[in-house]
Amino acid sequence: MDSYLISIAGNIAAGKSTLTKALEKRTGGRIMSFLERVDYVKENGYLQKYYEAVSAYDRLKGTKLVGKDRNDFLKVKEAAEYWGYKIQETYFLSRLLDLGVLSELLREGQSVAQDRSIYEDQIFTKNSNNNEYITDEDYRRYLDLFKLVMRNKPTPDLIIYLESDVAALKSRIVGRSRGEESELADPGNSYLSNLNDLYRPWIMKCGFPYLIVDTEEIDFRTEQGLEQVVGDIIRTVPGTKDLFD
């Protein structure tokens, strides 16, 4: 049986881990769930520092500041740019290590459903550059590094994009109560909205077979919803049928 790499894509709290685990259970392990490794980022407090830094910068952007207030603003901007690049660099290196593990699993004939692939880094990095969390120079450096490093790396046989509206994402973030994400649920925080604006254009041009699953229309936590997703997977990549039989 051929092995397949299915990458689950989507905004924060879109349900990627949920679908990844559901596919593993549905196939009796013929598809192995491979969850995003974020322990290193969380243990070092990087994620919370990043969200705090960029949220502080967003609150001050566009205001007219002089004197001490202006100096304070520049410090906030500097912190946002530092953590903007730091967090992206850390995630990129972590996902690069994951690719090594995935390559071995695929060579051994194990199909994998992956919670967020390294290719989604392009969305988060572009968002950071758009919002001045990453300088133009650092953004160009990242793109050059990405192209160089990703040569001859395994590519997804299918990307499933879980599309969700921002209100639903914020509701899920509140519900799962992860402290480092609390800033994202604030009514005036536009971080999730900015990412959402980038996702659909990205998936349409990703260069891989893809599915778009509207999470407001399809609840894959239910048997009926999951079977609808499974049917769409098989229609898009017919070779995966044996995994679900």
Predicted regions and their residues:
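NTP-dependent small-molecule kinase module
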Residues: 171-245
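Hydrophobic anchor at the beta1->P-loop junction of P-loop NTPases
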Residues: 8
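A glycine- and Lys/Arg-enriched "phosphate-lid" helix/loop adjacent to the NTP-binding pocket
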Residues: 121-198
